[in-house]
Amino acid sequence: VYSGNYINDIEETEKTLGFGMRADILAQAEEICENFRKNRSTDIVVLRLDHLYCIPRDRKDVNNICARMCLECLSEGYIKADTDHTFSMLFEKDAVEYIYKVVSTGKHEYSLYQLSSNDVVSELELAAMVQEHMADSANIVTSSGGIGRCVLSGTRFEKEYGVHAFGDLNRNIEKMAAYMQKHKAVFVNEDKLELPWWKVLWNQWKWLLSVLFPF
């Protein structure tokens, strides 16, 4: 819901200013939730997740900038990076803990929280991490898109819930690179990922265990 260059971290009170259909839809969805909360006097909370990422299992899961850079390195032999773009990365496991805190709390001080982390990084820095951990001679192709610095502040959430991200971006990139290299054919050629029977069973039922035992 935000685009452009912000010198300071963006607080929840900052007016939304995004570009494109996706940004418009998200902003309208937030407004609908807020209006419904006020009109119905219900406890509705909107959560903004800042650049969520995870280790993809196959090509269809490549939906974040980290995985996209790893895939470019594997398939194209180069990594594209915008020299002007700086942002924050939130690992999937941290996001799960954050959301659990909100869900398990009976009363919320605010109706809007931004889930962010201290992993503020530029595209160029991120590309360098990928290049290092992919152990590849791929070049980093830079461009200047004028996107700027756009980092969501997670201060409101941290003050109320007393938690902060514990994921290590560099370490997670290392794990992602190792996994994608190991299963290169799955990502580059889109071959079917072959798993042992116990992993297939685990993937089918792990959601239930996550609900029963969140941590």
Description of each model-found segment:
Residues 1-23, 38-40, 57:
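Active-site "gating" loop of Rossmann-like NAD(P)-dependent oxidoreductase/epimerase domains
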Residues 2-4, 47-64:
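Flexible, glycine-rich beta-alpha linker
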Residues 18-30, 63-67, 88-89, 120:
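Short-chain dehydrogenase/reductase
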Residues 19-45, 74:
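Active-site Tyr-X1-5-Lys
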Residues 28-32, 36, 65, 69, ...:
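Hydrophobic alpha-helix immediately C-terminal to the catalytic Tyr-X-X-X-Lys motif of short-chain
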Residues 45-47, 113:
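Hydrophobic/aromatic beta-strand patches that form the interior of the parallel beta-sheet core
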Residues 50-52, 58, 68-90:
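A conserved pocket-lining segment of Rossmann-fold NAD(P)-dependent short-chain dehydrogenase/reductase
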Residues 81-211:
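C-terminal substrate-binding subdomain of Rossmann-fold SDR/epimerase-dehydratase oxidoreductases
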